[in-house]
Amino acid sequence: YGAQNLLDLCASTGQRCGFIERESSGEIANVADGPINLNNTKVEGVDIVARYLLEADSGTWSFMLSGARLLDLEERSTLPDGSEFVVDKVGTAASREAFPKWRATFQTQWSKGAWSGSYKARYIGDTVEEPSPGDFRKIRTVTYHDVAGGYDFDNGLSIRIGVDNVTDKQPPVSFTNLNINFDINTYDPVGRFFYGRLTWDLDL
């Protein structure tokens, strides 16, 4: 802010007068012109989680559905004249991160005896980016599908194989991410990905 700016704001608008200390005579004793956090972020949302467990002849099944709805995301900045600049980021995308209204995950796991398997769907809602003033561009929704299966041997050895992003979904192009052309913090940077894991429990 600066001491003079604080004095001007107090005199002209009545703002920031609390930063000015006065003597009993009314003369200025001190102006609190130290580091001040003038920006703040307001976030509001709703998270929903539902789980269900099923015991059947075909095995044990578990289901989980979680969803997140972003209701409010405001970034407020105080300008030198004391006015406030507010940016509503719900449903928008920027150079470092996207803020979709909806995110959701569905997962089911199955096990019977030594066998197990799982399926997961990850949903990211659409957003709008503004690469240049007044130029609005929609970024589509993205859903990833992951599958995996495994087997546990009697000697403590376990094997598991899986595929993440089964449909080889590529991250949507983003014009606000000029260096790599997509949002690496929101979307999977790698396409279809195969993996295998072998573990051995020595306690068995």
Language-model features and meaning:
Residues Y1-P131:
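Gram-negative outer-membrane beta-barrel transporters
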Residues T41, S111, V142, D152-D154, ...:
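A short, compositionally biased micro-patch
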Residues E44-I48, W102-F106, T143-G149, R192-L198:
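Hydrophobic, lipid-facing positions within transmembrane beta-strands of outer-membrane proteins
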Residues T60-S62, T143, S158:
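Ser/Thr- (and often Asn-) enriched beta-sheet segments in non-cytosolic proteins
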Residues L71-D72, A121-E129, Y151-L204:
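C-terminal beta-signal and adjacent terminal beta-strands/loops
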Residues E130-P133, V142-D146:
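Short, local alpha-helical segments
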Residues D135-R137, G150-Y151:
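Hydrophobic alpha-helical bundle architecture
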